[in-house]
């Protein structure tokens, strides 16, 4: 399988000079790093080339790396039923730089790109209707960014007296905790069930006889 994926990476890189910035085969999967300006060209090639025929778009999603200058990855997953293989495309961008929409190539990307915009604030040029998909119309911020507060900015509830949904400032019943979202250790719990029974000493073997 790895040989097939390496051959596919070489084929795409040779056909699209300059569009493929890097490739990686790991765990039986091929990932191509793509120049954002070339994503539509790459998607079209992968769909139409006889050696590819990636006709199915599985997903488009965002990933947030706050410490990076270009903090977002836009990740595309495509499937070729003809070749029985999947491919992953990645492009890097920031909060202000839009990525070309691939809706003209894969119409099914429409809601995927809207979700990435809603959850991360990633912008897509050429999208037919780039608006929020999962959050409310007046929602403030993008909830899957790692610097988005876990409490949110407002509470939403139904007021029976007013007979409508109302928005109120968040009320915290305990002191606010500043979550260090860049630390790999924040929130890690190493105490496992049964650890409280351990004495810290190795068990004593039973006496013979």
From Swiss-Prot:
GO terms for cellular component: plasma membrane. Its EC number is 7.1.1.-. It catalyses: a quinone + NADH + 5 H(+)(in) = a quinol + NAD(+) + 4 H(+)(out). SUPFAM superfamilies: Nqo5-like. GO terms for molecular function: NADH dehydrogenase (ubiquinone) activity; NADH:ubiquinone reductase (non-electrogenic) activity; quinone binding. It comes from the Bacteria. It is an enzyme of class 7 (translocase). Keywords: Cell inner membrane, Cell membrane, Membrane, NAD, Quinone, Translocase, Transport, Ubiquinone. NDH-1 shuttles electrons from NADH, via FMN and iron-sulfur (Fe-S) centers, to quinones in the respiratory chain. The immediate electron acceptor for the enzyme in this species is believed to be ubiquinone. Couples the redox reaction to proton translocation (for every two electrons transferred, four hydrogen ions are translocated across the cytoplasmic membrane), and thus conserves the redox energy in a proton gradient. NDH-1 is composed of 14 different subunits. Subunits NuoB, C, D, E, F, and G constitute the peripheral sector of the complex. NCBIfam families: NuoC_fam (TIGR01961), PRK06074.1-1 (NF004730), PRK06074.1-5 (NF004733). This is NADH-quinone oxidoreductase subunit C. It comes from Xanthobacter autotrophicus (strain ATCC BAA-1158 / Py2).
